[in-house]
Swiss-Prot record:
Part of the 50S ribosomal subunit. Contacts protein L20. Belongs to the bacterial ribosomal protein bL21 family. This is Large ribosomal subunit protein bL21. Keywords: Ribonucleoprotein, Ribosomal protein, RNA-binding, rRNA-binding. It comes from the Bacteria. GO terms for molecular function: rRNA binding; structural constituent of ribosome. This protein binds to 23S rRNA in the presence of protein L20. GO terms for cellular component: cytoplasm; ribonucleoprotein complex; ribosome. It comes from Mycoplasmoides gallisepticum (strain R(low / passage 15 / clone 2)). One of its GO terms (biological process) is translation.
Length: 100
């Protein structure tokens, strides 16, 4: 059995005991998070969400992804600008899926 949940502006397909990476959430390691925005669970589609369904996850880690380097070049001026970016993420483990 799997479910489709919404976190931020993205959707994730999850199963029990899955570990997923989502956009950074303001939670501490070890906390439990309940997602109420469930689009699909156990062959039931929501309109837009399944009533009473929820997915419970545990926060395993807060971190940042690998660095992405971006170079901006301005032509005819021999000028370069170098930028770096590391996207923060939260690693979650699916603990329970409730049908509702």
């Amino acid at each position: 059995m799997f479910a489709v949940i919404a976190s931020g502006s993205k959707q994730y397909r999850v199963k029990l005991n899955d570990e997923i990476y989502v956009e950074k959430l303001n939670s501490q390691v070890g906390e439990k998070i309940v997602f109420d925005k469930v689009y699909f669970v156990n062959n039931t589609f929501g309109k837009p969400f399944v009533k009473g369904a929820s997915v419970t996850c545990e926060v395993l880690k807060q971190g940042r992804q690998k660095k992405i380097n971006v170079i901006k070049h301005i032509s005819q001026k021999h000028h370069l600008k170098k930028y770096g970016h590391r996207q923060p993420y939260t690693k979650l483990k699916v603990v329970a899926i409730n049908h509702g």
